[in-house]
């Protein structure tokens, strides 16, 4: 996240020239790092990213539910302004998650994303428990969270199962996605995102 815009835009140009049409342009850490470490404005970076890839490329960022790009819960006016400002500065999709899978923390932020005219990629957060532990992190639990999203009538364009810890097993991912596909039908785009560091 602590990379100067001038240093990474040549790579974006090369990826665009190679035919890429979807980029993750940032998230909470990228937004914060520009101000805290790089002495750059996050909105200037978004504008330059958009200018580099052109008008037709999907630019995506990440939001932390009611925290949006902050580390604490934000007021409703800040959550709404976040969606509107990111739209204004060229973002087209926001992947919206709550690390504890509290659907209530996705409802207002997701509605703001949708109302701003952005694509809302709603997230179910995945992880594995330590060896020897049993509990909530099963395909049944994750599909239950997805059902809660559907029951909340939360508008979304796509669904992402996000494993930020990089610990979920392939079997859990397979069973979760298979059940989610049966629940969502064939037309909803499902994304799996994992941090495999």
Question: What residue ranges belong to the model's regions?
Answer:
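Conserved N-terminal beta1-alpha1 strand-loop-helix module at the mouth
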Residues: 1-25, 33-34
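Conserved, mostly hydrophobic/aromatic
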Residues: 15, 96, 159
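A structural motif
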Residues: 17-20, 91, 154-156
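Active-site beta->alpha loop and helix N-cap motifs at the rims of alpha/beta catalytic domains
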Residues: 22, 27-147, 163-166
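Short helix-capping segments at alpha-helix termini
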Residues: 52-55, 115-118, 152-154, 182-188
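Phosphate/pyrophosphate-binding betaalpha-module
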Residues: 142-156, 170-175
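Catalytic alpha/beta core domains of metabolic enzymes, predominantly
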Residues: 164-197
